[in-house]
């Protein structure tokens, strides 16, 4: 595989550029549902900090940066960067966090042999119980869509004005439920999503709110049914993940001189 060019996150203040082990594009672009006229670019990546930042008193878990303003929503020229330490990411992935699991299946913009040891073994991070966080996040998005949770997203008020509801929340509901079903049935998450045309149509307001609720309920039911017969283990092997993490850190530090 072409290792590709390492993204320059140092320009955003990232202090461990040489410790980066993978990077990918996330968000709507990864799902295949990006609207070029409105969406920013979301960068995700993983790095292994120096030993003192893992074993010492001053531990770190992530680096975040955005070129967007705090008072206004991001535009198509803005960039969001979210980089996790390998340790933090593994903990999230082992719990079935949808965004963390995407790292295992997303097309890579940059990768290393260190990350290869994880990407070739996605199954150790997958379990039947992971349907719960996917559907939980979908339910959260539905509640926000219906105004039952959180505050109104003022940066996307034009979506409500135009379509009667926040179509981006709706897209995430359908996406997450579909990912949960595929994960239970096949032990993978296809990125970009096979139904990306449908997701774009949802974002453009081609579906009524009633249709979104009906489709979401149907996909949730199918995901739960798939969980019952899923070939995935009941839970992840945390000992195996811990051994893989320890080996990756020791090898990386040895090769880089700590």
Task: Go through the PLM ranges and name each one.
Residues 17-18, 36-38, 168:
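A generic fold-level signal
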Residues 28-31, 49-52, 181-182, 189-190:
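Short, solvent-exposed loop/turn segments at secondary-structure junctions
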């Amino acid at each position: 595989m072409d290792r590709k060019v390492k993204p320059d996150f140092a320009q955003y203040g990232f202090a461990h550029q040489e410790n980066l082990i993978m990077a990918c594009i996330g968000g709507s672009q990864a799902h295949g549902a990006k609207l070029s006229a409105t969406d920013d670019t979301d960068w995700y990546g993983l790095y292994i900090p120096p030993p003192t930042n893992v074993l010492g008193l001053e531990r770190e878990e992530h680096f975040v940066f955005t070129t967007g303003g705090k008072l206004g929503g991001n535009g198509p020229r803005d960039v969001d960067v979210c980089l996790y330490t390998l340790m933090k990411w593994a903990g999230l992935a082992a719990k079935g966090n949808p965004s963390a699991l995407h790292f295992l299946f997303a097309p890579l913009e940059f990768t290393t042999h260190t990350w290869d040891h994880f990407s070739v073994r996605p199954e150790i991070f997958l379990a039947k119980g992971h349907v719960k966080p996917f559907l939980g996040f979908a339910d959260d998005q539905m509640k926000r869509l219906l105004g039952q949770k959180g505050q109104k997203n003022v940066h996307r008020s034009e979506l409500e004005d135009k379509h009667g509801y926040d179509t981006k929340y709706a897209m995430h509901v359908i996406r997450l439920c579909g990912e949960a079903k595929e994960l239970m049935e096949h032990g993978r998450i296809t990125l970009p999503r096979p139904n990306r045309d449908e997701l774009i149509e949802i974002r453009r307001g081609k579906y009524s709110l009633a249709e979104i609720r009906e489709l979401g309920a149907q996909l949730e039911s199918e995901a739960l049914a798939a969980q019952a017969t899923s070939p995935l283990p009941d839970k992840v092997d945390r000992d195996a993940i811990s051994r893989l993490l320890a080996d990756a850190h020791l090898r990386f530090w040895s090769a880089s001189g700590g």
